[in-house]
Amino acid sequence: MKTRITELFGIERPIIQGGMHFVGLAELASAVSNAGGLGLITALTQGSPENLKREVARCREMTDKPFGVNLTFLPSINPPDYPGYIQAIIDGGVKIVETAGNNPQRFMPALKEHGIKVIHKCTSVRHSLKAESIGVDALSVDGFECGGHPGEDDVPNFILLNRAAEALSVPFVASGGMANGRSLAAALALGADGINMRSEEHTSELQSP
């Protein structure tokens, strides 16, 4: 199957593994990538930039397919070493980054300079348009069905995806409540270029033992 997302990321199926804390390790990311989707290592799960470098190297031993890193920018009095994580991504040769949370604009020049494609998670069309304006390559549009994220406007995907398709120029995937092929077909019909899945992949046979 070809969509703008498969062509952008060089994957076989328009399915992205959402970043999940605690389980966003090389085993899950490589399993998703080997199955034709886009697996993601969760940066903050690793605990430090050095650990992220090691996890990226482990993932390369498990797959020769494209995979990426999820990096969530959280408001904090003592924030994680975000510049260090960005440098670890660059040093590890990662070419796809999923960002979430706060605006990633301050890190965009460094990522773009190294040819890294950025997909940013948004929970509204207005935030999606802002992300598009700062140069992200793609978007994950998260409807109210999506768990684990603040900022939803109580707008479900059946409404949100239609609006996103009307307003956005860059490719976008649907996130929230995506579980199987019927979900993918529905998302494509509503204008998305693929889907972002989390819990379903972790609880399926796709997850390596």
Predicted regions and their residues:
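Glycine-rich adenosine-cofactor-binding loop
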Residues: 170-184, 198
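Short, glycine/charged-rich "phosphate-handling" switch motifs in NTP-dependent
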Residues: 193
